[in-house]
Protein backbone atom coordinates (compact mmCIF):
# COMPACT_ATOMS: atom_id res chain seq x y z
CA UNK A 1 0.00 0.00 0.00
CA UNK A 2 2.84 2.40 0.88
CA UNK A 3 4.49 1.71 -2.48
CA UNK A 4 1.18 2.32 -4.27
CA UNK A 5 0.75 5.65 -2.51
CA UNK A 6 4.25 6.69 -3.59
CA UNK A 7 3.51 5.75 -7.18
CA UNK A 8 0.32 7.79 -7.18
CA UNK A 9 2.05 10.77 -5.57
CA UNK A 10 4.70 10.59 -8.25
CA UNK A 11 1.99 11.30 -10.80
CA UNK A 12 0.70 14.36 -8.97
CA UNK A 13 2.35 16.91 -11.21
CA UNK A 14 1.74 20.61 -11.69
CA UNK A 15 1.32 21.65 -8.10
CA UNK A 16 -0.67 18.57 -7.15
CA UNK A 17 -3.47 19.18 -9.62
CA UNK A 18 -3.05 16.04 -11.73
CA UNK A 19 -4.70 12.75 -10.85
CA UNK A 20 -4.51 9.27 -12.32
CA UNK A 21 -7.85 8.01 -13.59
CA UNK A 22 -8.87 4.37 -13.39
CA UNK A 23 -8.06 3.85 -17.07
CA UNK A 24 -4.57 5.31 -16.71
CA UNK A 25 -5.42 8.63 -18.33
CA UNK A 26 -3.60 11.50 -16.67
CA UNK A 27 -6.06 14.32 -16.11
CA UNK A 28 -5.88 17.67 -14.34
CA UNK A 29 -8.82 20.03 -13.98
CA UNK A 30 -10.41 18.48 -17.07
CA UNK A 31 -7.01 18.53 -18.77
CA UNK A 32 -5.28 15.68 -20.58
CA UNK A 33 -1.70 14.67 -19.82
CA UNK A 34 0.63 14.78 -22.81
CA UNK A 35 2.16 11.35 -22.47
CA UNK A 36 2.68 8.12 -24.36
CA UNK A 37 -0.50 6.56 -23.01
CA UNK A 38 -2.82 9.36 -24.13
CA UNK A 39 -0.86 10.04 -27.35
CA UNK A 40 0.91 6.77 -28.37
CA UNK A 41 2.31 8.15 -31.64
CA UNK A 42 5.26 10.46 -31.01
CA UNK A 43 4.27 12.77 -33.86
CA UNK A 44 0.70 13.23 -32.61
CA UNK A 45 2.24 13.82 -29.18
CA UNK A 46 4.38 16.60 -30.67
CA UNK A 47 1.25 18.21 -32.11
CA UNK A 48 -0.31 18.17 -28.65
CA UNK A 49 2.83 19.65 -27.08
CA UNK A 50 2.75 22.57 -29.51
CA UNK A 51 -0.67 23.60 -28.20
CA UNK A 52 0.41 23.31 -24.57
CA UNK A 53 0.78 27.06 -24.07
CA UNK A 54 2.06 27.00 -20.49
CA UNK A 55 4.26 23.94 -21.07
CA UNK A 56 2.88 22.05 -18.08
CA UNK A 57 2.56 18.79 -20.06
CA UNK A 58 -1.22 18.99 -19.77
CA UNK A 59 -3.76 20.10 -22.35
CA UNK A 60 -6.40 22.08 -20.50
CA UNK A 61 -9.87 22.65 -21.93
CA UNK A 62 -8.90 25.89 -23.69
CA UNK A 63 -5.79 24.32 -25.25
CA UNK A 64 -7.85 21.38 -26.50
CA UNK A 65 -9.86 23.81 -28.66
CA UNK A 66 -6.90 25.28 -30.55
CA UNK A 67 -6.36 22.59 -33.20
CA UNK A 68 -9.04 22.79 -35.90
CA UNK A 69 -7.28 21.09 -38.84
CA UNK A 70 -4.65 18.33 -38.99
CA UNK A 71 -2.59 17.52 -42.09
CA UNK A 72 -0.45 14.38 -42.38
CA UNK A 73 1.90 14.30 -45.37
CA UNK A 74 3.80 11.18 -46.42
CA UNK A 75 7.20 12.25 -47.69
CA UNK A 76 10.88 11.37 -47.37
CA UNK A 77 12.20 14.93 -47.15
CA UNK A 78 12.15 17.60 -44.45
CA UNK A 79 10.19 15.37 -42.10
CA UNK A 80 8.96 16.67 -38.79
CA UNK A 81 6.11 18.51 -37.11
CA UNK A 82 5.41 22.14 -37.86
CA UNK A 83 2.23 23.83 -36.73
CA UNK A 84 -0.70 21.57 -37.61
CA UNK A 85 1.31 19.66 -40.25
CA UNK A 86 3.05 16.31 -39.77
CA UNK A 87 5.53 15.43 -42.51
CA UNK A 88 6.51 11.80 -42.02
CA UNK A 89 8.32 8.97 -43.80
CA UNK A 90 7.02 6.32 -41.40
CA UNK A 91 3.33 7.16 -41.25
CA UNK A 92 1.23 7.38 -38.09
CA UNK A 93 1.14 4.34 -35.81
CA UNK A 94 -2.04 5.49 -34.06
CA UNK A 95 -4.36 8.49 -34.19
CA UNK A 96 -5.31 8.01 -30.54
CA UNK A 97 -5.25 11.39 -28.85
CA UNK A 98 -6.80 13.48 -31.61
CA UNK A 99 -10.19 12.83 -30.02
CA UNK A 100 -9.18 15.23 -27.23
CA UNK A 101 -9.13 18.17 -29.66
CA UNK A 102 -12.77 19.20 -29.39
CA UNK A 103 -12.69 21.70 -32.28
CA UNK A 104 -10.82 19.48 -34.76
CA UNK A 105 -13.04 19.56 -37.86
CA UNK A 106 -10.76 18.45 -40.70
CA UNK A 107 -8.11 15.75 -41.22
CA UNK A 108 -6.18 15.27 -44.46
CA UNK A 109 -3.83 12.33 -44.98
CA UNK A 110 -1.92 12.54 -48.25
CA UNK A 111 1.40 12.44 -50.04
CA UNK A 112 3.89 14.87 -51.44
CA UNK A 113 6.67 14.08 -53.87
CA UNK A 114 7.30 10.41 -54.66
CA UNK A 115 4.86 8.12 -52.81
CA UNK A 116 6.03 5.04 -50.96
CA UNK A 117 4.15 1.82 -51.60
CA UNK A 118 4.99 0.68 -48.06
CA UNK A 119 3.06 3.53 -46.46
CA UNK A 120 0.09 2.41 -44.41
CA UNK A 121 -2.62 4.47 -42.79
CA UNK A 122 -3.15 3.72 -39.11
CA UNK A 123 -6.16 1.44 -38.86
CA UNK A 124 -7.67 3.51 -36.04
CA UNK A 125 -8.03 6.71 -38.09
CA UNK A 126 -11.82 6.57 -38.01
CA UNK A 127 -11.98 5.26 -34.44
CA UNK A 128 -10.52 8.44 -32.92
CA UNK A 129 -12.00 11.09 -35.22
CA UNK A 130 -15.65 11.03 -34.24
CA UNK A 131 -15.76 14.83 -33.88
CA UNK A 132 -14.23 15.47 -37.33
CA UNK A 133 -16.58 16.59 -40.12
CA UNK A 134 -14.22 16.34 -43.10
CA UNK A 135 -11.81 13.44 -43.70
CA UNK A 136 -9.60 13.25 -46.80
CA UNK A 137 -7.37 10.23 -47.40
CA UNK A 138 -4.60 9.81 -49.98
CA UNK A 139 -4.92 13.15 -51.69
CA UNK A 140 -1.88 14.78 -53.31
CA UNK A 141 -1.89 18.51 -52.69
CA UNK A 142 0.40 21.48 -52.43
CA UNK A 143 2.70 21.00 -49.46
CA UNK A 144 2.20 23.92 -47.04
CA UNK A 145 5.75 23.42 -45.71
CA UNK A 146 7.78 22.64 -48.83
CA UNK A 147 6.73 24.75 -51.83
CA UNK A 148 8.66 22.54 -54.28
CA UNK A 149 5.82 20.04 -54.27
CA UNK A 150 2.69 21.08 -56.11
CA UNK A 151 -0.76 19.61 -56.37
CA UNK A 152 -0.89 16.63 -58.72
CA UNK A 153 -2.90 13.53 -59.53
CA UNK A 154 -0.32 11.18 -58.04
CA UNK A 155 -1.64 8.60 -55.64
CA UNK A 156 0.01 6.79 -52.82
CA UNK A 157 -0.96 3.31 -51.74
CA UNK A 158 -2.63 2.44 -48.49
CA UNK A 159 -3.32 -1.22 -47.94
CA UNK A 160 -5.88 -2.93 -45.76
CA UNK A 161 -7.67 0.25 -44.84
CA UNK A 162 -10.87 -0.31 -42.86
CA UNK A 163 -13.50 2.39 -43.17
CA UNK A 164 -16.26 2.26 -40.59
CA UNK A 165 -18.47 5.32 -40.13
CA UNK A 166 -21.72 5.40 -38.19
CA UNK A 167 -23.98 7.98 -36.56
CA UNK A 168 -21.71 8.25 -33.54
CA UNK A 169 -19.37 10.25 -35.80
CA UNK A 170 -19.86 13.83 -36.98
CA UNK A 171 -18.35 13.12 -40.41
CA UNK A 172 -20.26 14.92 -43.18
CA UNK A 173 -17.66 14.64 -45.96
CA UNK A 174 -15.40 11.69 -46.83
CA UNK A 175 -12.98 11.73 -49.76
CA UNK A 176 -10.85 8.71 -50.69
CA UNK A 177 -8.38 8.32 -53.53
CA UNK A 178 -6.27 5.31 -54.51
CA UNK A 179 -7.09 3.33 -51.38
CA UNK A 180 -7.22 -0.44 -51.13
CA UNK A 181 -10.18 -0.93 -48.84
CA UNK A 182 -10.38 -4.10 -46.78
CA UNK A 183 -13.69 -3.21 -45.15
CA UNK A 184 -16.21 -0.46 -45.84
CA UNK A 185 -19.24 0.16 -43.70
CA UNK A 186 -20.77 3.62 -43.91
CA UNK A 187 -24.14 3.95 -42.19
CA UNK A 188 -24.76 7.59 -41.39
CA UNK A 189 -27.55 10.14 -41.54
CA UNK A 190 -24.96 12.92 -41.23
CA UNK A 191 -22.96 12.05 -44.36
CA UNK A 192 -23.58 14.62 -47.13
CA UNK A 193 -20.59 14.15 -49.45
CA UNK A 194 -18.89 10.88 -50.41
CA UNK A 195 -16.12 10.73 -53.02
CA UNK A 196 -14.42 7.40 -53.74
CA UNK A 197 -11.95 7.70 -56.62
CA UNK A 198 -9.74 4.96 -58.11
CA UNK A 199 -10.24 2.83 -55.01
CA UNK A 200 -10.20 -0.94 -54.79
CA UNK A 201 -13.33 -1.74 -52.81
CA UNK A 202 -14.11 -5.09 -51.19
CA UNK A 203 -16.59 -7.41 -52.92
CA UNK A 204 -19.12 -6.65 -50.22
CA UNK A 205 -19.55 -3.27 -48.59
CA UNK A 206 -22.32 -1.24 -46.96
CA UNK A 207 -23.22 2.35 -47.77
CA UNK A 208 -26.42 3.66 -46.19
CA UNK A 209 -26.47 7.46 -46.31
CA UNK A 210 -30.07 8.71 -46.70
CA UNK A 211 -29.08 12.40 -46.59
CA UNK A 212 -26.24 12.19 -49.10
CA UNK A 213 -26.08 15.17 -51.47
CA UNK A 214 -22.91 14.41 -53.48
CA UNK A 215 -21.65 10.99 -54.58
CA UNK A 216 -18.58 10.32 -56.73
CA UNK A 217 -17.44 6.76 -57.41
CA UNK A 218 -14.95 7.23 -60.27
PLM feature spans:
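Intrinsically disordered, low-complexity repeat segments enriched in small/polar residues
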Residues: 9-10, 28
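Alpha-helical polar/charged "hotspots" used for coordination or helix-helix interfaces
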Residues: 203
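Hydrophobic alpha-helical segments and their boundary regions
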Residues: 4-5, 11
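N-terminal capping/linker segments that flank leucine-rich repeat
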Residues: 2-4, 22-162, 167-182, 190-192, ...
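Bacterial N-terminal signal peptides
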Residues: 10-20
Amino acid sequence: MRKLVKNVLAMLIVGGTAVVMGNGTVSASNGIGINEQNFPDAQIRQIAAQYDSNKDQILDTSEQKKLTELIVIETTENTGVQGNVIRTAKGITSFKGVEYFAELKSISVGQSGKPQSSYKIASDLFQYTKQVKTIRVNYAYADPVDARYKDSDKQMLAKNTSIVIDDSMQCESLSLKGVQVQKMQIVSKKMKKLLIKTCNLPDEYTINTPNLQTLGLK
